[in-house]
């Protein structure tokens, strides 16, 4: 077992995820003479790929303009702008198609393999790595890294019960949010933005949404502090989820972490409707003679609000008919619809895409090659960097892009 680990390697890649594999394949294809090794601490490579997108793998997003693409990244967008001019979603699509995997675009522009199976993506990455001569070792954890006086790095790797030595000319760190590796990177002189969760759901306990799990509203506007996000929202057993919530959690990741995941939340159930416009519509419903004797609770004034939700938002009115609603009640209802006040009591996990914000300070990385500006021959790719996107394939895209650039840098540098 220890024979391979004491061998001198040209390239060692810590992390067997999407960025690590993409870098390894790119590097080995550009320079087949290089000895490339991937170290993966778990018992399976590409685990995140396999569980993402509900097992379908949201490979990327059909956004092919780098200037627009960077707007989907709460952190790291500006650093990625130049990187996306060299490898962007269109290049990702072409890469997978060239290697035998076709992608499809869904209505919301998320892109998946036509097989609807994440295993398709994991299998092609494993196959291409093996085909390019990349060696992969699982259950191998990077324990220590030292810069060698003669160039390159001396590593200590734990595999099984042993800690074994390894030497490499270049090292790529692609270990995501792994805390042990963060400490190693710090020991080499890099600064780290401490990671906190991003892309999570909100725990909310409120009688207005009790028993409504599964009810979706097509377009709401959410406000928290100075942040605003709009889009679909889903009521769950534990609170609120859906694209609008996930985007707000991403942009507000640090704010919510500082608040211990407790905050006030304003919900406009009508999207961009203002109070005055809402009052006018409610008044028309009151004045319309056919409505006068209909109960407010069963006759929604807005088609975009599901009837079950409408009933609970109007509970304070009781069983009144539209013709009997008072001006005060009408104003209170308008305020409830356009600026409902809720309390976030904690965070839930978005199982399809676990993401953190934070990581290696981007000013310390050359985004043309992904090489460290602090330590020669040290490279970074993927979520170990202080980059995170909203849900929709953007986090995988930053992994493909930084992995591809790192692979090019490792092969040519």
Where in the sequence are the language-model features?
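Beta1/beta-strand and adjacent pyrophosphate-binding region of the FAD-binding site
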Residues: 4-19
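Glycine-rich FAD pyrophosphate-binding loop
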Residues: 12, 28-54
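A conserved FAD-binding loop/helix module that cradles the flavin
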Residues: 170, 174-188, 387-413
